[in-house]
Amino acid sequence: MDKFIEFLRNKKIHVVGVTGAEGSNILRFLIKHKLTGVTTHDCVKENQIEQSFKLWHKGISQTEKEKLFKGFLADLSQSHTSFGDKYLIGIDHADIVFTPQSWRLYKERNQKLWVAYKKGIPFYSITRMYLDYAKAQIIGVTGTVGKGSTAYILKQILENSGRKVYFTGNETWTLQMVDRIDEMSKDDILILEISHRQLLDGFSRAPNIVVFTNLFPNHLDELSWDKYKEIKTSLIKFQTKDDYSVINYDSSELRNISVRLRSKVLYFSAKSTHMNIKSIQYITTYLKSNKNMHITDNVLAAYSATSLFQDPKLLSTDFIPSLLFLPARMQLLSTKSSVNFYDDIKSTTPWSTMEALRKLGSNTVLICGGHTKGINYYDFIQFTEANTRKIILLKSELSTEVGKFFPNDKFQVYDCLKEAIFKAFKISGENENILVSPAAAFFYTDFIKGKDSIRKIITSLPPRELI
């Protein structure tokens, strides 16, 4: 880390998306180490800085948020700022650029970034900083679906190990902590949720332990299935014979890849109990007997990784009932007029929505919609038609895709979430479920941001007989 800091000294450093969770924490790291010549960029206007910062730092109390924002303004004052219309001005003269994982998504807005990238200016991500420089034992959790939940479960279990546990993910409720990287020792544990975009700017060291939840053809609007697989599996392929890969045996893609890995492979399986290591096979039985446990795969993955620490007390099922799960993932928000409302808006793929429906059963009205990311939805449509009371779609790419396969009388389309929830409530029977699970991307941006939250809509519902 010292060499990296010296490398940065006297360089023209540019930080993109500085009001975000990644950008603001990178700036904190730079200022903490007394690095000068920093230029900060954000597409928001200067009078929107506070609003944007607080939007991207959700998972803390209001008091903590105010304190963090005050510190951020102090850091920002020590940089040259390029906001609003000045966004990315001078980026082509940078010596090094720190970018958030999302920068490639906004091609039109970030054209100057692409020019700088193609020019050969080094781009660095916060994930690469963790992987390359953290002294802690790193557990990287990746996969198409369930990586955030698995990482969060793992954090809660390992906090009982007596070792200091650091955890950060892709969500706005988790704080980044690259500014604390120099505090981490080899006796500490750093748990990272890692998406494919976080690997695109490279890394020079793979985690000692990688947990791979599953692999599905996702993000096909950005890259091909083969390229997605190549990037997604780069973590486990870069591991050495001294590392461990915790692999979902139920994924044929991962199963085929696992036989060619240099690392030591541990399988976990919700379908084949005998494929789990002996020390956690009884956990499989426990989970199958608990009908309320809707994330069996994630719990098995976390316990399989935990087994590598060879501490029997950490493998107790006593932890399971007290586990906290991430918000907006099969979260029971409310029961009204004997109808259960579930918030699952973090489900941005058809596979995670289908899994939610398997857990809830066919007495469920599904509300979904969003950007399809180039995914083939035929299997999803067949499954949901057979396993739901009714499908309600919000007008989007997904509703267009569904319309290609089924006539309009098979489903209903609404322009706004409030209308969809009102309709779902009206047609639901006693002890039935309403599941808001997008199965596609940008649901929050398109249907919730700047509008009423799901909870607020539910609260405003009149008695069902009056609708």
Predicted regions and their residues:
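Flexible active-site lid/hinge loop adjacent to a nucleotide/diphosphate
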Residues: 184-261, 266-267, 272-290, 445-448
